UniProtKB/Swiss-Prot annotation:
The modification Phosphoserine is found at residues 291, 320. It comes from the Eukaryota. The modification Phosphothreonine is found at residue 292. The gene is orc1. Belongs to the ORC1 family. The lineage of its organism: Eukaryota, Fungi, Dikarya, Ascomycota, Taphrinomycotina. SMART domains: AAA (SM00382), BAH (SM00439). It comes from Schizosaccharomyces pombe (strain 972 / ATCC 24843). GO terms for biological process: DNA replication initiation; mitotic DNA replication checkpoint signaling; nuclear DNA replication. This is Origin recognition complex subunit 1. Component of the origin recognition complex (ORC) that binds origins of replication. It has a role in both chromosomal replication and mating type transcriptional silencing. ORC binds to multiple sites within the ars1 origin of DNA replication in an ATP-independent manner. InterPro entries: AAA+_ATPase, ATPase_AAA_core, BAH_dom, BAH_sf, Cdc6_ORC1-like_ATPase_lid, ORC1/CDC6, P-loop_NTPase. ATP binds at residues 334, 368-376, 455, 488, 557. Mg(2+) binds at residues 454-455. Residues 218-233, 275-284 have a biased composition (Basic residues). CDD domains: AAA (cd00009), BAH_Orc1p_like (cd04715).
Length: 707
């Protein structure tokens, strides 16, 4: 399999390490707050409104100061760039150790958000260019990844005359330059600026942002008639929109962002106009009528899942060998090469490459149990195809990922796809009409679009209209839509989907078998290649973890989590990971907080969850109606073998309204999703894996005969 050329930033810290929180409150002292949030290097210089402000923070032996340029993990396998403007802690969080950072964001010239509409792009943008923006917000210091270097244009090219090629993993993701500012809400840029004047000087950066807000913000029309006095003068902002800048020839060295229509004068005079004749007023007094309230038309953008980013080298990582190992073993980190999936990679790559080259639509169905590398393999294929597209060996294409576990309803998939294609946020019904019109009509400028529909099981509805549309659009002659469906069930099309949908999937199917213990050993050893000389893991420990996981599920993610937890245990004992520590980590993971919550549920809550699982397996749908689950619960209680089953069943019949409280409590605890709490026809589905419920209720004496 070819090695990916694209580089992605290293995610050393993914928020709070979840394995640190896997035990109960008695073990809370094991949480290393210094590792997660860092420590202050000095006393606060200011206290105001319940906050204490500091000038520097030490985290993982690295000092971060106000004015430093950093990369920040965004919580979804990607990263942002910004400059630190504030470091502080809140009085209410002082005992928890939480510390906060406020950053002014930089927007990358080749980021996804900058490639929404081609007419908004600058013709001379560079792969290492970032723009200073007006956006800023608050984040936990646990999200800080590392320092980065942001130069002016002259400094950058004096240091790197030929630029930084993407193959330089040690330089490419952490060196950038700034020559313009951007206001993303109005799609306007500033004139070229010398960033060396602003670098590491927050006062000058703040003045620049104020000037950008004044000059780049959208103009608002003023109501009322204009007087006959002196003509008003409106100063022209010294900026230009993206639309006008895209019309300038990129080969011109004297590239100017000002519009050609601007003259040398600073002000533009607008002559007064004759006011229109006033219409005859109504008899009703307008002061007695209630005015219609104005509605804010802004819509929060949908959460579109980005591709995971490639890790950097750990040569300069400040930390112990065990910390390096845990960073490499994290499920969010992406290795340099994908192990043990060469055949599946080649099949998926050839299918997508041929569809993009021929500019045709296609459907591909990928199935396999959780943790077998389905999504990771598709991401690997997409990154290689994008690299070929950037090199000009493949036509341009767009990529959109829709995760069934991250949408509240299946119809939201329409809005996500439309927003990914156009950048416009519309309702699901409107988006469906727009997409149908787009894919049924030809367009000479349309490029191919690859849609990854992950967790397809969660997008199955009773009428199956969403899946039918997504699998039918690729068959249209002008759609150029390529749908890659990923599900955990191999026979999902035959068992659940109707014949009209199954026929559109065709014979393009790629099954993923569970990993064997040999493959799991290879995967773990490849992750630990960077710390092999430190002798952190023994070969017997890796072999023991691989065999334990392969005997149960073959889930690579579970194997990596077990090894990470064993590394923490070994670091506390100043030793290396042994089979005994692997066994201890496995025992702790089976006693996770989720398992404890499920085991401590009431009898009625347990019966309801068992009924949902049975209903899912019987119907094949992730969603069920409340009345269907109630009927399933009654059926389960009839077959119970416990001595007091009849008494409990009678209580259920007499006090059936209690299920309303059961539903509310399970929904509030995040165990299930509930559409409408007050209706028996409401739809309900699990918010956790059904395997967690089976593991928690196995051996429960109250549920004998049904669980």
């Amino acid at each position: 399999m070819p090695r990916r050329k694209s580089l992605r930033s290293q995610l050393l810290i993914n928020g709070i390490d979840k394995s640190l929180l896997s035990d109960d409150s008695a073990d809370s002292s094991d949480i290393d707050e210094e590792e997660v949030y860092g420590v202050w290097t000095e006393e606060p210089f200011q206290k105001e409104a319940g906050r204490s402000y500091y000038r520097s923070l030490k985290k993982n032996d690295v000092i971060y100061r106000v004015g430093d340029d950093i990369t920040v993990h965004d919580g979804d396998s990607s990263f942002y760039l910004g400059v630190i403007c504030k470091l502080y802690e809140k009085a209410i969080d002082k005992h928890s150790g939480k510390k906060y950072v406020e950053a002014i964001w930089y927007s990358r010239a080749y980021a996804k958000r900058m490639e929404i509409k081609p007419e908004y792009l600058l013709p001379d943008r560079h792969i290492n260019e970032v723009y200073v923006s007006c956006g800023r917000d608050e984040n936990l210091t646990s999200c800080i990844i590392e320092h980065c270097n942001v130069y002016s244009e002259a400094e950058f090219f004096s240091k790197f005359p030929a630029g930084i090629p993407t193959k330089r993993k040690d330089l490419f993701p952490c060196n950038f330059f700034i020559r313009r500012g951007v206001h993303l809400k109005v799609n306007k840029y500033t004139e070229p600026l010398d960033w060396s004047y602003y670098a590491h000087n927050l006062e000058r950066i703040e003045d620049l942002l104020v000037e950008m807000e004044e000059n780049l913000r959208p103009t608002k029309k003023k109501s009322g008639s204009r007087g006959r006095g002196r003509p008003r003068k409106y100063p022209l902002p010294n900026v230009e929109s993206k639309e006008s800048s895209s019309k300038v020839n990129s080969k011109d060295e004297n590239f100017d962002l000002q519009d050609d229509s601007e003259s040398s004068e600073d002000n533009l005079t607008i002559q007064p106009q004759t006011p229109r004749r006033r219409h005859k007023r109504s008899r009703h007094n307008s002061s007695n009528l209630a005015s219609t309230p104005k509605r804010n038309g802004y819509k929060q953008p949908l959460q579109i899942t980005p591709l995971p980013i490639r890790m950097l080298s750990l040569e300069e990582f400040q930390g112990s060998p065990h910390r390096k190992a845990r960073a490499m073993l994290h499920v969010a980190s992406v290795p340099s090469t994908l192990q043990c999936r060469d055949n599946e990679f080649s099949t998926i790559f050839s299918n997508l490459e041929s569809a993009i080259e021929e500019e045709t639509g296609a459907c591909l169905y990928i199935s396999g149990t959780p943790g077998t590398g389905k999504t990771a393999t598709v991401h690997e294929v997409i990154w290689n195809l994008q690299e070929l597209s950037r090199e000009g060996q493949l036509p341009e294409f767009s990529f959109c990922e829709i995760n069934g576990m991250r949408v509240t309803s299946a119809n939201q998939a329409y809005s996500i796809l439309w927003e990914s294609l156009t950048g416009e946020r519309v309702t699901p019904i409107h988006a469906m009409d727009l997409l149908d019109n787009r894919f049924t009509h030809a367009s000479p400028n349309r490029s191919s679009c690859v849609v990854l529909m992950d967790e397809l099981d969660q997008l199955v509805t009773h009428n199956q209209k969403v899946l039918y549309n997504f699998f039918n659009w690729p068959s249209l002659p002008h759609s150029r839509l390529i749908v890659v469906a990923v599900a955990n069930t191999m026979d999902l099309p035959e068992r659940i989907l109707s014949n009209r949908i199954s026929s559109r999937l065709g014979l393009s199917r790629v099954p993923f078998e569970p990993y064997t213990h040999t493959q799991l050993e290879i995967i773990i050893a490849a992750r630990l290649e960077a710390v092999r000389d430190d002798d952190v893991f023994s070969s017997d420990a890796i072999r023991f973890a691989a065999r334990k996981v392969a005997a149960v599920s073959g889930d690579a993610r579970r194997a990596l989590d077990i090894c990470r937890r064993a590394s923490e245990l070994a670091e506390n004992k100043n030793g290396k990971v042994t089979p005994g520590l692997i066994h201890q980590a496995i025992s702790e993971m089976t006693a996770s907080p989720l398992q404890k919550v499920l085991r401590n549920l009431s009898f009625m809550q347990k019966v309801f969850l068992c009924a949902i699982v049975n209903r899912m397996r019987r119907s094949g749908f992730a969603e069920s109606y409340v009345y269907e689950v109630l009927e399933e619960a009654e059926r389960l209680l009839r077959v119970m073998t416990t001595p007091d089953a009849e008494a409990k069943f009678g209580e259920l019949i007499l006090r059936r309204p209690e299920f309303g409280y059961v539903l509310s409590s399970l929904s509030e605890n995040g165990v299930l999703y509930l559409e409408n709490k007050s209706s028996r026809n409401a739809r309900v589905r699990l918010a956790i894996a059904d395997d967690e419920i089976k593991l928690a209720f196995r051996g429960d004496s109250e549920l004998a005969g049904i669980a």
